[in-house]
Amino acid sequence: MKAYAKANIFLKLTGFDSRKYHLLESRFILLKDLFDELELVDKESDSKKEFEIISNFKCENNIIQKAYLLLSKRYNNELKELFSKKSLKLTKNIPVCAGLGGGSSDCASFLLLMNETLNLKLNLQELINLSIQLGSDIAFFLSGFHSANVSGCGEIIEEFEDDIPNLKWTFPQISCQTKAVYDEFDRGIFDFQKNNNQAQIYKKLSTKELLQNFKNKELNDLFTPCATLYPKMKSYLQEDFFLSGSGSSVFKVDR
């Protein structure tokens, strides 16, 4: 099963919820040519792990493990039987700490794979309700939409009929820590009402129109704090690249 990456075309922070989590307005688009892959494979006879992930990256305490534990509260017997014979193979192609949602997409694909394999018969809303307990971007990947306006803490998804130009990507070898970038944003000067007003304009425009008519700092509230925390990102800010999420992946329209 393919777990596709995503890009944020705009990302505006508009307040906090009751848990002090950031509220956002954003355009998410699915990147169909960049994906991780998940599959069930026969378990090695000497493996003693109840749930084993075989991967080309470090998997301890990752979001798929958390999804397994959450599902096991309701489907413990089914999961134990499956993973007594199978392991989960995860092939990572999406850069990590890059603003592309790789972990969230992997988690969504794991939930979908379990729903299909174990015939759990969970509908989309039930899957989204589970995903909210795990992470903020997962709902978009569950939706299957190619483009959507996303709000709340990432759980409110509205499909958008979009015009998406070809994008040229650059993946700096910089691991941007999401929490650190958000914390740096909080230390700055911001106007949530202004951000929300801008977002209401942006969400009506196509991705092509957004990238043609607005500056990178206007579209993504996290670009300035990202460049402050990670000085090597400043050159991309100055050279009119657009930032996805909290970084470090950047892109331009491929003309």
Swiss-Prot record:
Keywords tagged on the record: ATP-binding, Isoprene biosynthesis, Kinase, Nucleotide-binding, Transferase
Keyword set includes Mitochondrion: no
Catalytic activity: 4-CDP-2-C-methyl-D-erythritol + ATP = 4-CDP-2-C-methyl-D-erythritol 2-phosphate + ADP + H(+)
GO MF annotations, alphabetized: 4-(cytidine 5'-diphospho)-2-C-methyl-D-erythritol kinase activity; ATP binding
Superkingdom to which the source organism belongs: Bacteria
Residues of the signal peptide: none
Disulfide bonds, paired cysteine numbers: none
Entry keyword annotation includes Methyltransferase: no
EC number(s) per entry: 2.7.1.148
A Gene Ontology biological process term: terpenoid biosynthetic process
Pathway: Isoprenoid biosynthesis; isopentenyl diphosphate biosynthesis via DXP pathway; isopentenyl diphosphate from 1-deoxy-D-xylulose 5-phosphate: step 3/6
Top-tier EC class: transferase
Transmembrane annotation, as ranges: none
HAMAP family tied to this protein: IspE (MF_00061)
Family recorded in the similarity comment: Belongs to the GHMP kinase family. IspE subfamily.
Entry function: Catalyzes the phosphorylation of the position 2 hydroxy group of 4-diphosphocytidyl-2C-methyl-D-erythritol.
Descriptive protein name: 4-diphosphocytidyl-2-C-methyl-D-erythritol kinase
Organism: Campylobacter jejuni subsp. jejuni serotype O:6 (strain 81116 / NCTC 11828)
